[in-house]
Amino acid sequence: MFRSGADDPLSPSCLLRRLSGRRVGADGQKQLVAAVKFWYNGVLGKNLQLDYLYPDRPEFKIPKVFSQQDIKAMLNVCENIKHKAILATIYSCGLRLSELTNLMIKDIDSTQMTVTIRQGKGNRDRVVVLSEKLLLLLRDYFVEYKPKEYLFEGQSGGKYSERSVQQVLKQTLAKAKINKEGSVHTLRHSYATHLIEQGTDIRFVQELLGHKNIKTTLIYTHLTDATKRKIKSPLDNL
């Protein structure tokens, strides 16, 4: 089909030039290499070793978290009860941004003291614990805002926008004078980290976060401040 490897747009050398000459994301690079591997190895039967073309594994980064003092400060400066309820719900339930905006009133079970997160990441439902403090806060919020279907709704009805939630957090961080970079997902990271700090079994944390693979949850077993304080210097044993 091709006269030579140099003319072959699927040759490893051509592929390398394409990857270096364009801004190809890691996922796109994986798909491209997999397709070329299939062509050479599966169709042409050449059995070329192309694994070196896969993107390097990203560096491990410990997720950023807010301290419990940070969380308390945020909630204390929230004068708008809706904003306070939004941030408290994310942190208390370890929610992703989309899970928060998709929460419906029917998902809150004050009898069983549970919150059902429907169709989370990977289209998997899960159930988390409903905090007693959160329930009291939500009841006060209900009295004032009277949502009809979604737990948090926009001014014209329908679910609250993700952008609005992000703006709430940004304004709250500034008001609480917390000079840390953080996003809505940082609240979820904080929830997981604080659970582990208080001794919650990693398997329970995995279930509460909705992680399919325990390896994803294990990133939260990094050395937390609480763990560091328990470590004794060998000098103290002399």
Regions found by a protein language model. Name each.
Residues M1-L238:
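Conserved catalytic core of the tyrosine transesterase superfamily
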